[in-house]
Amino acid sequence: MKINFINLGCPKNLVDSENIMGFFKKENISSYHRADTVVINTCGFIEQAKRESIEEILKAIGDGKKVFVTGCLVYRYKEELQKEIPEAVFFENIKDLEGIELLQTPKRQLTTKHYAYLKIAEGCNRKCSFCAIPNIRGHHRSKSIEELVEEAIYLKEKGVKELIIVSQDTLYYQEDNSFKSIIKLLDALEKLDFPWIRLMYLYPNSISKDFIDYIDNSKSVLPYFDIPLQHISDNILKSMRRGYTKKDVFRLLEQINAMKHKKPILRSSFIVGYPTEEERDFEELLDFISQELFHFVGVFEYSHEEGTYAYQFDDKIPKEEKQRRYKEVFNLSQEILEEKNSALVGQEIDILIEKKDRARAFFQAPEIDGIVFLEKSSPKTGIIKKAKVIANIGTDLLVDI
């Protein structure tokens, strides 16, 4: 049997895929074209992701593959999928599969070389009106510090230089929400001497002054704040059930920017076209983003998802209008990023060389924040070096090492 794995969706899904791969012998893992069997780990978070997942399943079936499907789409629509696509096998636990030889002592197979994600929890206890994740993944469940340290040691032995901590609500680790438990975990991980530790998905309400101070004084935790605000209008934030106000956001950003030892890098993401979003709310969001408080901005069109609190609202904003608002925010975010990158020209930055001709700066998370091109090829990869920025190429950078 030759088996290929297709991962769709977020970094948390990638960790799941890598763990599933660990149940198979390396020699059985193959490219898509050589494989007779395909395992697809789906995303079912929003409409676009659901369409992509279905398309991948049907393509693999059409290509004559034996298809096994798992992930959020299966957790959410397993019965419907089994009825509509009987050619595929849909599963929630790899150990439930019959007729496939699995290793008894699985070891996670990394698909990335110099960085890896450490998923510290599953599920979410938040009640955001637009989000289906609690329905799909269940309530928040944390892994123990001991289990995570053991996994991190394994990743370190595999040559990982950057450890990226992820979950649906990272600072809610061990259902503490007062930052103390996540600090205990970070203390334990710092002892392993990863050069870079990055945290993703920081819920605004959970970012305390003490946590900010910890980042400011940490030797390896990067001053990278990924804070998905979703909106800035108080009307929309209240309807979204986010639990904070515009004033709270500005107070938080002021605290972060008051760091004494490090210069913070901020990323956020926003939803446009939410059912109750009026033009004035959208203009308020544009004005907020235009203040250039964030280095990186992600934007998504609202997806009307059954089972969510917001599903009771009339999804009245036309698709064309959602697309217009999306394009305005996206274009603005790209302009801001180009300006911020231009300001880096002539400065020295720390980079992780991932390939002979490219790298990432400490302020760039994989896949979403752009890349760094090397003017001259590096003979070594997997090393962190100082580099001088000599140009910005759109939203990317060119450096001399």
UniProtKB/Swiss-Prot annotation:
Listed GO CC annotations: cytosol
Tagged with keyword Iron-sulfur: yes
CDD domains tied to this protein: Radical_SAM
EC numbers: 2.8.4.4
SUPFAM superfamilies xrefs: Radical SAM enzymes
Domain MTTase N-terminal: 1-108
Catalytic reaction equation(s): L-aspartate(89)-[ribosomal protein uS12]-hydrogen + (sulfur carrier)-SH + AH2 + 2 S-adenosyl-L-methionine = 3-methylsulfanyl-L-aspartate(89)-[ribosomal protein uS12]-hydrogen + (sulfur carrier)-H + 5'-deoxyadenosine + L-methionine + A + S-adenosyl-L-homocysteine + 2 H(+)
MF GO annotations: 4 iron, 4 sulfur cluster binding; aspartic acid methylthiotransferase activity; metal ion binding; protein methylthiotransferase activity
Signal peptide (residue range): none
Residues annotated for [4Fe-4S] cluster 2 binding in this entry: C124, C128, C131
PROSITE patterns reported for this sequence: MTTASE_N, MTTASE_RADICAL, RADICAL_SAM
InterPro entries found in the cross-reference section: Elp3/MiaA/NifB-like_rSAM (IPR006638), Methylthiotransferase (IPR005839), Methylthiotransferase_CS (IPR020612), Methylthiotransferase_N (IPR013848), Methylthiotransferase_N_sf (IPR038135), NA-bd_OB-fold (IPR012340), Ribosomal_uS12_MeSTrfase_RimO (IPR005840), rSAM (IPR007197)
The entry's keywords: 4Fe-4S, Cytoplasm, Iron, Iron-sulfur, Metal-binding, S-adenosyl-L-methionine, Transferase
Compartment(s) where it occurs, according to its Swiss-Prot or TrEMBL record: Cytoplasm
Limits of the Radical SAM core domain: 110-339
Enzyme superclass (EC): transferase
Binding site for [4Fe-4S] cluster 1: C10, C43, C72
Membrane spanning residue stretches: none
Pfam families linked to this entry: Radical_SAM, TRAM_2, UPF0004
Cofactor binding, note field: Binds 2 [4Fe-4S] clusters. One cluster is coordinated with 3 cysteines and an exchangeable S-adenosyl-L-methionine.
Cofactor(s) required for function per UniProt: [4Fe-4S] cluster
GO annotation terms (biological process): tRNA modification
Function: Catalyzes the methylthiolation of an aspartic acid residue of ribosomal protein uS12.
Protein family membership: Belongs to the methylthiotransferase family. RimO subfamily.
Protein name from the UniProt record: Ribosomal protein uS12 methylthiotransferase RimO
